[in-house]
Design a protein with these regions (language model features):
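Hydrophobic alpha-helical transmembrane segments in multi-pass integral membrane proteins
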Residues: 54-65, 157-172
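Membrane-interfacial loop-to-helix junctions in multi-pass transporters
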Residues: 68-83, 110-115, 177-183
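C-terminal ends of transmembrane helices
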Residues: 24-38, 131-138
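Helix-loop-helix hairpins and the membrane-proximal interhelical loops
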Residues: 40-84, 105
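Membrane-interfacial segments at transmembrane helix termini in multi-pass membrane proteins
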Residues: 164, 168-178, 183-187, 193-202
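Alpha-helical transmembrane segments of multi-pass membrane proteins, especially transporters
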Residues: 1, 21, 43-47, 51, ...
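Membrane-interfacial helix-loop connectors
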Residues: 1-16, 21, 89-126, 135-141, ...
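Hydrophobic transmembrane alpha-helical segments of multi-pass transport and channel proteins
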Residues: 124, 128-129, 150-159, 185-201
Length: 202
């Protein structure tokens, strides 16, 4: 998330990474998987594809926001955005994808930082769905792990949601209106630190 905020929205990087995607993709297709360079090619392919995808998401979001009035969303309470984040992450099965979409919407001016924080907070719950799916036909131990992960994320989300308004004011004061992308990524890091502080002693 920090890498996306620092690089993905500051520079037009799709033209740089498109050739990397092509070259590394060809290498993956023809090089023996047992060779060390194969794994490096997979790494560069995945990283480059991430930034190319982000570029298309960003341009698509900017076009959508320019033709859509999202002002009415500001009237909704924070719980709506928490539920939206949980639902979106449950559908796409990736909190990273939710973060990329939310950063794009925030960068385009479609949503406020407060709305974005609610969406990212909700993604903590939505990301647990894939563990439930993976453990559906598995051992009882896998189901317990999935349930424990859900409860940890649920408690963390509830705790942070209760104090979301003062946390928003504090984060917004630290970063200001010009650094909202970094403020959102910092908030996600803060949520993870809260989770650690709540459950690490146990």
């Amino acid at each position: 998330s920090w890498l996306l905020a620092m690089v993905g929205f500051r520079y037009n990087i799709d033209q740089l990474f498109l050739p990397v995607v092509a070259i590394s993709g060809i290498g993956i297709a023809f090089i023996n998987p047992d060779r060390k360079i194969y794994h490096w090619l997979k790494f560069f392919f995945s990283l480059s594809f991430l930034f190319v995808s982000l570029s298309y998401i960003k341009s698509g979001m900017e076009g959508w926001v320019s033709h859509t009035d999202l002002g009415f969303f500001s009237r909704y309470p924070s719980i709506v955005f928490v539920l939206l984040g949980a639902s979106l992450t449950g559908v796409v099965q990736s909190s990273s994808a939710t973060m990329a979409l939310t950063l794009s919407a925030l960068h385009s001016g479609g949503i406020s930082l407060y709305m974005a924080m609610g969406i990212i907070l909700g993604s903590e719950i939505g990301t647990t769905l894939k563990l439930f799916i993976a453990s559906a036909n598995g051992l009882a131990s896998k189901k317990r792990v999935a349930l424990a992960n859900f409860l940890i994320n649920l408690v963390t989300t509830l705790v942070v949601w209760i104090i979301l308004t003062p946390v928003y004011r504090l984060v917004n004061q630290w970063f200001g209106d010009q650094q909202e992308l970094f403020a959102l990524v910092f908030f996600q890091t803060l949520v993870n630190l809260v989770s650690l502080s709540l459950f690490l002693p146990f």
